[in-house]
Amino acid sequence: MQAGQASDRYTIAVPREFFAEWLGEKLAAFRNQTPGVQYVLTADEHADFTEANLDLAVRLAEGPGDLEGVALTAPLRVTVAAHGASDAWIDWPGAPLPEGAEAAITAASPGQALASALAGMGRTVVPLALAEGALAAGRLVALGEPEPARRAYWLVAPPPQWRSKKVRALVAYLSA
């Protein structure tokens, strides 16, 4: 455990949109089952673990890379749009637009692309885990079936953090 880390406090770097759509609810449930747990959240999932004093990070990636990790979501993507949205495409780094399609909007992240689609600005391809809530609520429609993707949301950490008792407990809970 690094200086400044406590056995009941988790410092987690997580994309805002993934926290809002998937992780937040699960962290709340873990905290309810584990009295005294505290969270420190940061948005820079690619932050240096030592400099940011991180326990864990959530990354949209093909795998854990040189870190230890577990996939939190299946590697699936889906094309979505709001009811009555234009046919314009919303792009973001890593979004596989159809051949010949040109982006009318370029977003910086899948979360911005999802927000743009929810606003009726067009259609986009996003990780299924981000869109599931909006699809279930009827705020978005799927324009086709989910399809395999190269990337999923991974919970990662360097080996020393990954082996710690507190991290193992949260990893076990989130991957159950």
Outline where the language-model segments fall:
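Alpha-helical linker/hinge and terminal dimerization helices associated
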Residues: M1-Q5
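Central regulatory/effector-binding core of bacterial HTH transcription factors
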Residues: S7-P64
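Short hydrophobic/aromatic beta-strand micro-patches
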Residues: A13, V125, V156-P158
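Conserved strand-to-helix beginnings and helix N-cap segments that scaffold or border functional pockets
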Residues: L23-G24, L128, V167-R168
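C-terminal regulatory
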Residues: G63-A152
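A late-sequence structural motif
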Residues: P146-A176
